[in-house]
């Protein structure tokens, strides 16, 4: 309401595209979206397990300090699945590594037991399967042994859903 009242113009930079007809985006979620989103996700995980939550990013406002804070946390045997191969996922991976969470292949993620925190980053080839409109998402096949799912892949409202809320209880 305040935006309308003050006649503020809002621009969704994510949707500014070239005029060639190809639809290339000029801007997209970048590295810092992945960094901050992952920090906030890990902080929520800490809070959910009744530990003292970390300072919020806007309160710290210093990347070196953020890295220092997250590196002191112990995430035990947490398993994180991450999608995407762009700037946001690279930022997310950067933050997970600062949190001392080890990256493993999807094969190792699914088939091995670890005594430390791990994550796997899967590409579209590994989580999208079919073109005929049927059950195209393979993500739900990976979530049965996943504590946190971080979606960093490009998304469009026309894309099929990776899983539905009704599936969440199946993953427990």
Feature-to-residue mapping (PLM):
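Glycine-rich phosphate/diphosphate-binding loop of Rossmann-like nucleotide-binding domains
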Residues: 53-145
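Short, acidic Gly/Pro/Ser/Thr-rich loop/turn segments
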Residues: 18, 89-90, 157
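A short secondary-structure junction signal
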Residues: 22, 91-95, 161-162
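Glycine/serine-rich phosphate-binding loop and adjoining beta1-alpha1 elements at the start
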Residues: 1-78
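ADP-ribose/adenylate-binding Rossmann-like module
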Residues: 1-14, 148-172
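Predominant activation on well-ordered alpha-helical scaffold segments within soluble catalytic domains
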Residues: 38-42, 93, 97, 140, ...
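Short low-complexity, flexible loop/linker segments enriched in glycine and/or proline
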Residues: 25-29, 118-121, 166
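Generic secondary-structure signature for well-ordered alpha-helical cores
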Residues: 5-9, 43-51, 93, 97-101, ...
């Amino acid at each position: 309401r305040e935006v309308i009242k003050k006649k503020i113009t809002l621009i969704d930079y994510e949707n500014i595209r070239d005029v060639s007809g190809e639809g290339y985006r000029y801007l997209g979620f970048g590295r810092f979206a992945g960094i901050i989103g992952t920090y906030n996700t890990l902080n929520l995980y800490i809070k959910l397990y009744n530990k003292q939550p970390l300072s919020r990013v806007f309160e710290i406002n210093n990347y070196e300090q953020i890295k220092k804070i997250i590196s002191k946390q112990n995430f035990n045997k947490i398993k994180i699945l991450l999608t995407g191969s762009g700037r946001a996922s690279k930022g997310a991976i950067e933050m997970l590594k600062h949190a001392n969470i080890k990256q493993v292949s999807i094969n190792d993620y699914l088939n091995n037991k670890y005594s430390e925190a791990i994550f796997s980053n899967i590409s579209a080839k590994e989580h999208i399967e079919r073109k005929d409109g049927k059950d195209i998402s393979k993500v739900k096949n990976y979530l049965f042994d996943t504590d946190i799912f971080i979606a960093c892949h490009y998304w469009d409202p026309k894309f099929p859903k990776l899983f539905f809320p009704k599936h969440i209880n199946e993953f427990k």
